[in-house]
């Protein structure tokens, strides 16, 4: 994948799948306060949420096709960016060798920056990138009304980080 740099996957979710996912996320926000505050963005985050773990496996063939790699899932979570969120440029840990971030719902634009490239995802679109190697983040402080983002992480089955397969899933069930 090192030669791909990053790739936008259009229609990662069908309209029906996206609708279900949006409703699910907003129900979690409204009725379940079991989130963690993400230390990077200061926003609510749900790590290894059961639906997101199901998506980690369900979307594996799509991610493998687009990365041209055989992958092991590592973990998944989703975050709801709130007014005042901040996400500085960073790289992720080795369990995020291959990462996918999906725009679930947004009311305002707050682009991704990956290796100095500005990327705007539409709802349902995904960005495939090397989270462990590529610096990524978002510019400035979020001044919008909310944005839900899904993160699916994988490692190359033949790579140096394969020991991280399913690394946090069993710990957080």
Language-model features, listed with the residues they occupy:
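Non-heme Fe(II)/2-oxoglutarate
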Residues: 1-67
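Catalytic core of non-heme Fe(II) oxygenases with the double-stranded beta-helix
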Residues: 83-138, 145-150, 156-170
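Active-site donor-binding loop signature of nucleotide-sugar glycosyltransferases
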Residues: 11, 140, 154
